[in-house]
Each structure stands twice: as C-alpha cells, then as structure tokens.
Amino acid sequence: MSQIRLTFLKEKNKMKAIKKEFNKKAALLEEKVVKINRITKVVKGGARFRFSALVVVGDKKGQIGFATAKAKEIVEAIKKALEKAKKQLVRIPIVGTTIPHDTIGRFGASKFFLKPASKGTGIVAGGKAARTILELVGINDVLTKTFGSRTSINVIRAVMDGLQSLRTKEEVAKLRGINLAKKEQ
C-alpha cells in the first residue's frame, strides 16, 4: 500500500477511537428537557411551525452542559439539542454535596445567587430550569435566589455563569501563590 493510504487508515482509526471514547462518556450522562417552545413564522401561504428545545445534560459528578436547537419536529429538536449539549460539557467544582463558596451568576437581565448549604438542606431553588441544572451537576445542598428575568434560557445561562465562577480552596491558593500545606500546620 502507498504511504498516503497508510496515513489515511491511521487517521481513520484515531477518529474511531475518539468517537468510541466520546460515546462512553455520553452513555454516563443524564439528560433532561427543560422547555419546548413552538415557533411560528407567518408567510404568504399561512403559518409555518417549528419547535425549539432547551436541554440540559450532566453526570451528577460535576460535569454539565446545556443547549438549544430548532427543528420541524419535537423529537428532532430534542435530538439536536442533546448532541450540542454533550459537546459543550463544563467541569464544575463541588465540595461534598454543595458548592465551595457564595457566587452570583449574571446573564442579560437575570441574576442568580448561589449559597452553600449544610448537608440535608436540599436544593432550595425556584423554577424548573435552575433546579434541573443543579440536580444534573450533582449539587444536592444549595440555597438560591433568582433576580430579574426568569426566562428559562436566561436563568440557565446565569446559573452556568455562577457555577463557572466557582473555585476550590486549592485553586484560589494556587492563583494567589500561597502554599496551603504551610498554612495548615
């Protein structure tokens, strides 16, 4: 076989291995549909309907992703949103069953306040969107408050902003150049 053909086959095998690994990770994810919206476009001949799906995926161990997608059928929209969400996974630091510290997430007119809670408190969150994202990321004890816009997508983006701003004690110490081992002795 020619050298080009061998190189092509090696690349193809690498891609198969990457896809296999991606599918293993995707199998561990839990998925929830937060909202389905009917979209109408009025044209000369009448109204054209499509559907928009807002989906959240997570492994309940600190990985979370969300996405929206549109399609002519509900099932297609959900499927497209799931694929997009799985590609946009983000790692969130969790301490035990709660978050490391207070934080505020902002997106547009939405503000979302997150505060750590003691074990057994549960998720104190108003609205399906915020509760869903916190459950799927694996946070079981947290106090929250939503301010401003309560639209599902805005709340989810505000929650994600807040969660992505979280840092563990070790990460903060490393950023500040402090050695925690010396401090604790």
Swiss-Prot record:
Any one GO biological process: translation
Annotated signal peptide: none
Sample GO molecular function, one term: rRNA binding
Keyword Manganese listed: no
Residue ranges occupied by any S5 DRBM domain in the UniProt entry: 29-92
Keywords per UniProt: Ribonucleoprotein, Ribosomal protein, RNA-binding, rRNA-binding
Highest taxon, organism lineage: Bacteria
One of the record's GO cellular component terms: small ribosomal subunit
Keyword Ribonucleoprotein carried by entry: yes
Gene3D superfamilies noted in UniProt: 3.30.160.20, 3.30.230.10
Annotated Pfam families: Ribosomal_S5, Ribosomal_S5_C
Described purpose of this protein according to its UniProt entry: With S4 and S12 plays an important role in translational accuracy. Located at the back of the 30S subunit body where it stabilizes the conformation of the head with respect to the body.
Complex formation: Part of the 30S ribosomal subunit. Contacts proteins S4 and S8.
Free-text comment on this protein's domains from its UniProt entry: The N-terminal domain interacts with the head of the 30S subunit; the C-terminal domain interacts with the body and contacts protein S4. The interaction surface between S4 and S5 is involved in control of translational fidelity.
Protein family according to the UniProt entry: Belongs to the universal ribosomal protein uS5 family.
Name of the protein in its database record: Small ribosomal subunit protein uS5
Organism: Aster yellows witches'-broom phytoplasma (strain AYWB)
Gene expressing this chain: rpsE
